[in-house]
């Protein structure tokens, strides 16, 4: 036992009156509050020449900036002071990039720049040689209507205004199919050959090349052209009635085909009536003039929202754009009894005695869509021009109109048209993507050699009756389709898909309608007398379009 160290019993305090130790020594150590989020740094860093100016206190303590936590080792009572109740400025610790706004993924930032980084003419297409993003740099070109979004909570936008349907769906209509745009965009029908001419009618006037020199310094007023343009539908066309007896099984006009083939770019509601008689299908339009009106800023982020009756309402702007397009397409031609005209094989099928008809050439063309589907459609040209080698080049003449650059969220034409025409065209491709796509499809279907675009603006934003021509531009339809990301294979695929669905249905009357508030089209089975009342009321308005005298 002597080899082991002695065991000494430790002293254990026993508290008879409570828990814990009986006595605690006074250490007199002050308590300094701290934060676990404080950054750890060096007391002195000799590797830098100057202290950091942007964040000089990034290593400071969160609780070290208030005098109430300061410790003074003094025995004198003079160090006693009251607690400062005025409050000090809260110290924000250094946190790199924690609350930095992410501009790249900011939805509002993308909306201000107008999608300037996407491909030309796609859904929201960008600049053809320019970008509209530069117009908002340094605060220039800002839209005053965007100030209505200021003050809203994040993720909340203005209430969406529901659009009206082009036709009222009746209770006795049977819904057959609903196809959303996502499915339609996946369709394709490649290797469709150029249309074959079956019949050509009408006569064309020659284009006046002086309008190619029009610019901002040499603008020309838009004149009123009192010439009649027929907008006869498919079943009322005498040439189509004659051709349907011997050839083809699907019949339509270029406006109807373009509306269906470009449906994935449309926002407004529209409808097409279909009549199936045995193996023949007629794509028709209702007896009203709404189908022939040109939309304005349909695909814009801020489409026209003014009330009906205003000069800037959607319907008023559509009427104005349609009249401008009619006047421009006739004014740029060499009109006169002594001027030469290009005449097709047959006369104008809609000619009337004592009526001054507009320059219009009709081509009835045939396409083989496969699976025994033969399409025959009436296409048109607006003018003709002689090429450099003496050949005749047919023109499709259209006009873009500016009504209010500030209210329409677009580029100021009078400032950018001569110097940055690509930015102006990119703005129009963004705001009127559907209308430009339809014009391009119509030019491709007709086999036009050139697509002439005119830029027409109001003399005063508050005056919708007077306009001036600011410039013109021309494109080859196929090249322009590529430029605006218009896939003709997809357009033919959409048309063929709807034709196949109708071919499987029994004989009767059907209607294709674009949903006014959803990205889809609907197919209905409707009664034979569904639109008899409209037919009796609007027969005259559906056959001709005459320039109104009050515009």
From Swiss-Prot:
Pfam families in the cross-refs: eIF-3_zeta
One function term, GO molecular function aspect: mRNA cap binding
Gly residues compositional bias, start-end: 119-128
Gene Ontology CC: one annotated term: eukaryotic 48S preinitiation complex
Region (RNA gate), start-end ranges: 290-304
Coiled coil start-end: none
Alphabetized InterPro entries for the sequence: eIF3d
Keywords: Cytoplasm, Initiation factor, Protein biosynthesis, RNA-binding
Keyword Cytoplasm in record: yes
Compartments it resides in: Cytoplasm
Biological process (GO), any one: formation of cytoplasmic translation initiation complex
Primary localisation category: cytoplasm
Renumbered residue ranges of the record's region Disordered: 105-152
Classification via PANTHER family: EUKARYOTIC TRANSLATION INITIATION FACTOR 3 SUBUNIT 7 (PTHR12399), EUKARYOTIC TRANSLATION INITIATION FACTOR 3 SUBUNIT D (PTHR12399:SF0)
Entry function: mRNA cap-binding component of the eukaryotic translation initiation factor 3 (eIF-3) complex, which is involved in protein synthesis of a specialized repertoire of mRNAs and, together with other initiation factors, stimulates binding of mRNA and methionyl-tRNAi to the 40S ribosome. The eIF-3 complex specifically targets and initiates translation of a subset of mRNAs involved in cell proliferation. In the eIF-3 complex, eif3d specifically recognizes and binds the 7-methylguanosine cap of a subset of mRNAs.
The protein's assembly and partners: Component of the eukaryotic translation initiation factor 3 (eIF-3) complex. The eIF-3 complex interacts with pix.
Note on domains (UniProt): The RNA gate region regulates mRNA cap recognition to prevent promiscuous mRNA-binding before assembly of eif3d into the full eukaryotic translation initiation factor 3 (eIF-3) complex.
Family of the protein in this entry: Belongs to the eIF-3 subunit D family.
Protein name: Eukaryotic translation initiation factor 3 subunit D-2
Designated gene of the protein: eIF3d2
């Amino acid at each position: 036992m002597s080899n082991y160290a002695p065991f000494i019993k430790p002293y254990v305090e026993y508290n008879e009156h409570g828990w814990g130790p009986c006595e605690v020594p006074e250490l007199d150590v002050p308590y300094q509050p701290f934060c676990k989020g404080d950054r750890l740094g060096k007391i002195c860093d000799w590797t830098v020449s100057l202290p950091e100016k942007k964040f000089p206190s990034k290593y400071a303590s969160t609780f070290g900036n208030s005098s109430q936590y300061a410790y003074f080792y003094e025995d004198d009572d003079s160090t006693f002071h009251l607690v400062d109740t005025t409050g000090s400025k809260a110290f924000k610790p250094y946190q790199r990039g924690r609350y930095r706004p992410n501009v790249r993924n900011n939805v509002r930032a993308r909306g201000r720049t107008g999608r300037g980084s996407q491909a030309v003419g796609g859904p929201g297409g960008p600049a053809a040689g320019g970008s509209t993003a530069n117009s908002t740099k340094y605060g220039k070109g800002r839209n005053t209507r965007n100030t209505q979004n200021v003050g809203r909570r994040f993720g909340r936008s203005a209430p969406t205004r529901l659009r009206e349907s082009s036709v009222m769906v009746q209770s006795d209509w049977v819904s057959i199919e609903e196809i959303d745009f996502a499915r339609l965009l996946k369709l394709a029908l490649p290797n469709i050959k150029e249309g074959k001419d079956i019949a050509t009618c009408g006569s064309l006037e020659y284009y006046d090349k002086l309008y190619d020199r029009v610019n901002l310094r040499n603008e020309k007023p838009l004149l009123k052209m009192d010439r009649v343009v027929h907008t006869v539908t498919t079943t009322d066309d005498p040439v189509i009635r004659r051709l349907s007896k011997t050839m083809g099984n699907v019949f339509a006009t270029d406006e109807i085909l373009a509306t269906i083939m470009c449906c994935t770019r449309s926002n407004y509601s529209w409808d097409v009536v279909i009549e199936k008689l045995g193996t023949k299908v007629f794509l028709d339009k209702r007896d009203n003039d709404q189908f022939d009106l040109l939309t304005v800023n349909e695909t814009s982020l801020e489409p026209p929202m003014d009330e009906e009756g205003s000069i800037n309402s959607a319907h008023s702007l559509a009427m104005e754009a349609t009249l401008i397009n009619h006047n421009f397409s006739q004014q740029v031609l060499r009109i006169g009894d002594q001027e030469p005209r290009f005449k097709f094989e047959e006369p104008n099928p809609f000619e009337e005695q004592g009526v001054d008809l507009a320059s219009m050439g009709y081509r009835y063309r045939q396409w083989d869509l496969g699976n025994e589907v033969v399409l025959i459609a009436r296409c048109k040209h607006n003018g003709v021009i002689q090429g450099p080698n003496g050949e005749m080049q047919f023109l499709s003449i259209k006009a873009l109109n500016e009504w209010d650059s500030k209210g329409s969220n677009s580029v100021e034409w009078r400032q950018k048209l001569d110097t940055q025409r690509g930015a102006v065209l990119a703005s129009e491709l963004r705001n009127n993507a559907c209308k430009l796509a339809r014009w391009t499809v119509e030019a491709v279907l007709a086999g036009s050699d050139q697509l002439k675009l005119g830029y027409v603006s109001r003399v005063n934003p508050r005056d919708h009756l007077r306009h001036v021509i600011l410039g013109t531009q021309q494109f080859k339809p196929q090249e322009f389709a590529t430029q605006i990301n218009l896939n003709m294979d997809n357009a033919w695929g959409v048309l063929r898909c709807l034709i196949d669905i109708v071919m499987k249905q029994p004989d009767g009357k059907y209607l294709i309608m674009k949903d006014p508030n959803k990205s889809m089209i609907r197919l209905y089975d409707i009664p034979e007398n569904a639109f008899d009342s409209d037919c009796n009321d609007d027969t005259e308005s559906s056959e001709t379009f005459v320039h109104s005298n009050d515009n």
